[in-house]
UniProtKB/Swiss-Prot annotation:
It is found in: Cell inner membrane. Its EC number is 2.5.1.141. Converts heme B (protoheme IX) to heme O by substitution of the vinyl group on carbon 2 of heme B porphyrin ring with a hydroxyethyl farnesyl side group. PANTHER family: 4-HYDROXYBENZOATE SOLANESYLTRANSFERASE, PROTOHEME IX FARNESYLTRANSFERASE, MITOCHONDRIAL. Keywords: Cell inner membrane, Cell membrane, Heme biosynthesis, Membrane, Transferase, Transmembrane, Transmembrane helix. This is Protoheme IX farnesyltransferase. The chain crosses the membrane at residues 35-55, 56-76, 119-139, 156-176, 183-203, 229-246, 250-272, 283-303. GO terms for biological process: heme O biosynthetic process. Carbon 2 of the heme B porphyrin ring is defined according to the Fischer nomenclature. GO terms for molecular function: protoheme IX farnesyltransferase activity.
Length: 316
């Protein structure tokens, strides 16, 4: 386990937030902006499928608070993981291991944004939404980052709950409660997470092993990982169509869900059938890339149907 005060690389002198030396972009990078975009997107879908109404200004402030909360947890994750980030090629250039920001600065920044995002969401929306955001931050930054990630090959499975919560928070903003719609969206993201990340883990197995992270390919072996990718994809395909059965996914969503679900299964089988060499890498990267497209298309279909009058019921 990394030390609470671990610093990788030289400290960066001067003020924490200035425009000199690229400090502002570095602090922004700590927030994992690509993850923040996904969080905003899935939280927004959680809002629009809810049976309720929220003032646009309140909705915008709430989305910003949710995004900042997600960024804060990402910042705390980078602070804790600075030692393993330094030995992995895809993370070695992050602000802390590269020495552009100190561990202490990142910790203070992450804690400040964590508290601020929860307080703002509580004031703008309601206490349930704020409590869910606080839980998400703690679960990702503490339970996943400080414990699960380095302790078990099920780290992605259990830790995936944090990434699946934004739609639930979004619905709580609108209705002050948790409904079946957001719980189904939670389940879809939760089941989507393992095959998505394990596809990447198959390619990066050596780096994860060098960093001491017990990812599934390093613990159960590549063959078992490939089989589990197929099983999760087989579970995800029908789960993705549940919104249609419950009446909040229409015809457009049904088509996207059916085609996308079959695609997930097809790509997972391709991973299973290509266990070696360049074919393995191409299959795993194909699975990784298609899984991103699948989730984006699925949630985009819901957003389009609910926001632009495209909803056409399939059942009933």
């Amino acid at each position: 386990m990394t030390s609470l005060t671990n610093t990788i690389g030289p400290d960066v002198p001067g003020p924490a937030l200035t425009t000199a030396g690229g400090d502002v972009p570095d602090y922004f990078a700590l927030l994992k902006p690509r993850v923040m975009v996904l969080v905003i997107f899935t939280a927004l879908v959680g809002m629009v499928v809810s049976q309720g109404h929220v003032q646009p200004a309140i909705g915008a402030i709430s989305l910003l608070a949710i995004a900042v909360g997600a960024g804060a947890s990402g910042c705390l994750n980078m602070w804790w993981d600075a030692d393993i980030d330094a030995v992995m090629s895809r993370t070695a250039t992050r602000p802390i291991p590269s020495g552009r920001i100190t561990s202490e600065e990142a910790l203070g920044f992450g804690l400040f944004l964590s508290v601020a995002s929860v307080v703002v969401l509580g004031l703008a929306a309601n206490l349930l939404a704020a409590a869910l955001l606080a839980f998400t931050i703690v679960f990702y930054a503490v339970v996943y980052s400080m414990w699960l990630k380095r302790a078990t090959a099920q780290n992605i499975v259990i830790g995936g709950a944090a990434g699946a919560l934004p739609p639930v928070i979004g619905q709580a903003v609108v209705t002050g409660s948790i409904g079946i719609e957001s719980l189904i969206l939670f389940a879809i993201i939760f089941i989507w997470t393992p095959p998505h990340f394990w596809a990447l883990a198959l390619i990066k197995a050596d780096e994860y092993a060098r960093a001491g992270i017990p990812m599934m390919p390093n613990v159960a072996g590549p063959a078992s990982t490939r089989r589990q990718i197929v099983w999760y994809s087989l579970l995800l395909a029908p789960l993705g169509l549940v919104p249609v059965a419950l009446g909040f996914g229409g015809l457009v969503y049904a088509v996207v869900g059916l085609v996308g679900g079959l695609g997930m299964v097809a790509f997972s089988i391709r991973v299973l059938r290509n266990p070696e060499g360049d074919a393995e890498r191409r299959a795993a990267m194909g699975m990784f890339g298609f899984s991103i497209l699948y989730l984006f298309a699925l949630f985009s279909a819901l957003l389009a149907e609910q926001s632009f009058g495209l909803f056409r019921p399939v059942l009933g």
